[in-house]
Amino acid sequence: YLETGKYNPRPSIQTIANAMDVGDPSNFARILDLYGCSWENIKSDISGVTYSDAQIGETLASTFKTENYLLDPHGAVGYRAISECLADDEVGICLETAHPAKFKETVDSLTGGDVAIPERLKAFMDGEKKSVQMLPSFREFKDFLMRE
């Protein structure tokens, strides 16, 4: 979309940065609304890149080795994009929203390490998953929240 202005949803392609494996993002309509459905406005503020699992893994491993900083796979994508795409006079900020231990198997295999899992994350990961099926209705959602 960013290159052509044409939105072509497609099946997701699985990668080690699984939150970025979205071929038909549910929030795309919100982005269009924010930018008045203008491709020109969107592409003036937003750019995009794609990386293979090998590139993501290389970034994660090399950053750990050279900077002693442990990225998660999603952070590795953002960090690589900033490293490759910023102009010399630009400053970038890379924020991660997940602890690398959430991707322990992947991170351990790429770094040769053993990521420690923080107690709060362990308790969350070991906790019981709770879900409730409901219709895609605001009224039903609101009623559920008011009951709980």
Language model features: what each stretch is:
Residues Y1-E148:
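PLP-dependent amino-acid enzyme catalytic core
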